[in-house]
């Protein structure tokens, strides 16, 4: 049976609706978590933050996906949002697997959180200072201000006047990077399903990153939404990225199993999301696709 253009457009609209419903249930779940203050522990606070962030981002993706054909210029924004979700999923999976293995996952959470602090200090003492030429005393004052706002990340001493002076960070030069996460996850004993998941998470993160950072492929990517030959490949990319993201978000939710026990409507929404995404992928793969 031939799959027509109208069939594909209807399936895209249906998947967008399923994604919106799924994101709505995620929002309700996050509200329940905050109402009961069930994220006091460092790991729960970390996973809640990633879940709520992803919920907002997927809500936006749903709106953009709904307008896939009507507003081609929106497609680039959709890819950039998905890139962020995929990156967070990899970091979240890293921490989750460390916790499962009985490793010091709190250290990894701290290292991830420290990234903003570390970058602020390096930017202040590097590019920002090159632009603004701060006097040395003012530069040190601002660096100390950043450190004093995040004292847990730094060694400190007290001077003769009783003033706390913050010195080197506690990580001894270590820093978080996606490369670190990929190295860790590839060293784990992953089953075939997990290997496939890791492959899709990184593949689509890497693909969408080519739009985030200008390079040889950027020209093609910024025009992809306007090229009918490439649009269907884009639809597959988005659907497969969503299927890779969902299992990681569900793992975050398992931090609050009592909130999932009687969520029959949520599981129905989850099932429908999978059905629509896989149906769209299957239908598109029945058609000749440029770049497939």
Predicted regions and their residues:
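Secondary-shell segments that build the walls of catalytic and ion/ligand-binding clefts
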Residues: 1-48, 113-242, 246-292
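Long, hydrophobic/aromatic-enriched structural stretches that serve as scaffold segments
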Residues: 36-97
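Short, glycine/acidic-rich hinge or "gate" loops at secondary-structure transitions
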Residues: 73, 97-108, 258-268
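Intrinsically disordered, low-complexity coil segments
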Residues: 66-73, 100-105, 188-197
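Internal, hydrophobic cores of structured domains that mediate oligomerization or house catalytic pockets
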Residues: 77, 82-133
């Amino acid at each position: 049976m031939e799959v027509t253009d109208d069939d594909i457009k209807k399936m895209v609209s249906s998947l967008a609706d399923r994604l919106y419903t799924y994101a709505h249930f995620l929002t309700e779940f996050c509200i329940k978590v905050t109402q009961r203050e069930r994220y006091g522990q460092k790991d729960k606070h970390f996973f809640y933050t990633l879940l709520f962030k992803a919920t907002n981002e997927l809500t936006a993706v749903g709106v953009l996906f709904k307008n896939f054909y009507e507003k081609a210029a929106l497609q680039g924004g959709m890819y950039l949002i998905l890139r962020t979700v995929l990156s967070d999923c990899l970091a979240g999976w890293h921490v989750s697997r460390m916790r499962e293995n009985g490793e010091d996952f709190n250290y990894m959470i701290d290292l991830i959180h420290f990234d903003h602090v570390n970058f602020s200090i390096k930017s202040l003492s590097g590019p920002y200072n090159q632009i603004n030429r701060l006097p040395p005393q003012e530069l040190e004052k601002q660096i100390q201000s950043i450190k004093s706002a995040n004292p847990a990340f730094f060694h400190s001493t007290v001077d003769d006047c009783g003033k706390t002076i913050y010195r080197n960070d506690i990580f001894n030069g270590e820093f978080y990077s996606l490369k670190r996460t990929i190295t860790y996850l590839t060293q784990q004993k992953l089953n075939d399903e997990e290997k496939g998941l890791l492959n899709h998470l990184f593949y689509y993160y890497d693909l969408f990153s080519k739009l985030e950072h200008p390079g040889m492929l950027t020209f093609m990517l910024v025009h992809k939404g306007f090229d009918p030959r490439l649009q269907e490949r884009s639809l597959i990319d988005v659907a497969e990225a969503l299927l890779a993201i969902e299992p990681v978000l569900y793992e975050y939710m398992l931090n609050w199993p009592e909130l999932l026990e009687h969520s029959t409507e949520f599981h129905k929404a989850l099932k429908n999301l999978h059905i629509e995404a896989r149906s769209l992928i299957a239908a598109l793969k029945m058609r000749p696709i440029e770049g497939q």
